[in-house]
Amino acid sequence: MFRVLNDDVYSPAEIQQQNPLAFGKASSLFTDNRSANDQCETGENVRESGQDHVKRPMNAFIVWSRERRRKVALENPKMQNSEISKQLGYEWKRLTDAEKRPFFEEAQRLLAIHRDKYPDYKYRPRRKTKRQQKLLPADSSILCKQMHVETLQPFTYRNGCAKTTCSRMESQLSLSQSVTITNSFFQKEHHNSWTNLGHNRVTLSTQISADFPFYQSLQPGLSCAYFQY
């Protein structure tokens, strides 16, 4: 039994000879984890180092609110940060110029130090993330078409199931098409009949006007006898 246990224990060299790919993956994972742990211990940022980023110099309000915010947070632990900011802004507006003067002087001193330390500093505000663009007219038309198709064919067919619904809808569509064709045919025939009637009226009036001298030449007695049945 001890022999079997001893045979199961392999050295790293034997593991590398048997499966070099697995050994390489395990070693790479070990080195990656070690480097990540080293970064966490040293406090390095993986995404971006803080050496290139330069903070803006504090203004008078920030100099004053830095200590005041701590006091308000300690006095009201349940108050949210947004509510604290509103309260600090209201209190800052109520301060007189004499009360604000020391904070303005401190801000000027910090600004001079900042200029000496970073002479080429330029404030570059961060760009705000753009909101999602609204649907274009083309996109909205495509959505409308898709909705129309979905209303006409709400079911998916499997092995010939639920085809009666499609046949009914197709029959309704064909019936509506036939009704529209029939209506257009009757409208066309009605229009043609009215045009023919108008043409016949014009022809009759022209014929009567042409025969009018002949009717005038007839004598009264002859005219009555001529038109007897």
Curated annotation (Swiss-Prot):
Keywords: Acetylation, Activator, Calmodulin-binding, Cytoplasm, Differentiation, DNA-binding, Nucleus, Repressor, Sexual differentiation, Transcription, Transcription regulation. It comes from the Eukaryota. CDD domains: HMG-box_SoxA_SoxB_SoxG. The keyword Transcription regulation applies. It is found in: Nucleus speckle; Cytoplasm; Nucleus. Residues 54-122 bind DNA. GO terms for molecular function: calmodulin binding; DNA-binding transcription activator activity, RNA polymerase II-specific; RNA polymerase II cis-regulatory region sequence-specific DNA binding. Gene3D superfamilies: High mobility group box domain. Acetylation of Lys-130 contributes to its nuclear localization and enhances its interaction with KPNB1. Deacetylated by HDAC3. InterPro entries: HMG_box_dom, HMG_box_dom_sf, SRY, SRY-related_HMG-box_TF-like. One of its GO terms (biological process) is male sex determination. One of its GO terms (cellular component) is cytoplasm. The keyword Cell inner membrane does not apply. PANTHER family: SEX-DETERMINING REGION Y PROTEIN (PTHR10270:SF161), SOX TRANSCRIPTION FACTOR (PTHR10270). Transcriptional regulator that controls a genetic switch in male development. It is necessary and sufficient for initiating male sex determination by directing the development of supporting cell precursors (pre-Sertoli cells) as Sertoli rather than granulosa cells. Involved in different aspects of gene regulation including promoter activation or repression. Binds to the DNA consensus sequence 5'-[AT]AACAA[AT]-3'. SRY HMG box recognizes DNA by partial intercalation in the minor groove and promotes DNA bending. Also involved in pre-mRNA splicing. Belongs to the SRY family. Interacts with CALM, EP300, HDAC3, KPNB1, ZNF208 isoform KRAB-O, PARP1, SLC9A3R2 and WT1. The interaction with EP300 modulates its DNA-binding activity. The interaction with KPNB1 is sensitive to dissociation by Ran in the GTP-bound form. Interaction with PARP1 impaired its DNA-binding activity. This is Sex-determining region Y protein. The gene is SRY.
